[in-house]
Structures are given as structure tokens and as C-alpha cells.
Amino acid sequence: MKRIIVMVLKNILFVPYYWIMLNWYAAHVDNYTEEQRYAMLKKIDHAANRGGNLCIQSYGVENIPSQNGFIFYPNHQGLYDVLAIMEVCPVPFSVVAKKEVGNVPFLKQVFACMKAFLIDRDDIKQ
């Protein structure tokens, strides 16, 4: 929690701009290409990581296919996995998340830009 506060405080001048831009892209998803939306999210992600004094190191990025799809299986229950993967992944991707986090401010807009799939974990027919 402290790290998130540090991230916001170090980017306090940019937070209103990023928030407005994120809301605009989320409201007009179909007006932007997947690459444009991903570039905007990467810009916000990079600023957040830099503000939190985080240095993300990656290995094997050259093995990520640029077409025909791929699946990442992060093994952490927190929400930081997506930020770390987004920092280093060269191609746009989406996420599958539980529907409960789909109404959390900020995550709601990020998921809209990513065209994330929200699932109900109680409904086994999904």
C-alpha cells in the first residue's frame, strides 16, 4: 500500500492528465487501435513504476510471439502482475479478471482499454 501511495505522490502533477486520458480512451475504445490503447497504458504504467522506484528486469522477451497469440500465467494474487508484464511485453495483450474488480475505479478504465474479460467465478458455465 505504501508503494502505491509513493507512486501517486511522485506523479501527482501527471495524475489528473493521465486520469482524464484514461477515462477518454475507456469511453471511446472503438476510436483507437489496440496499439494506440496499449501505448497509452504503457505510458501510464512506466510513469507509475518509475514513481515507485521500481526497476523491472525481464528475460526471454524475444520469445514472445508477435502473432497467433500467447498466454501468460502469472502466479501472484495481487494486481501488480499486469503492471510488471505491461512494462516489458512488446505486444498488446488483454487479461482475464474476476468480475468484482471490474467496478474498482482506475481498474475499470484500464480493463475497458485492454478489452479485458471479466468472469464470474461462481458461474461454472463461463
Label each PLM-derived region with a short phrase.
Residues 1-57, 109-110:
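A transmembrane-helix-recognition feature enriched in membrane-embedded lipid enzymes
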Residues 55-126:
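Soluble catalytic domains of membrane acyltransferases
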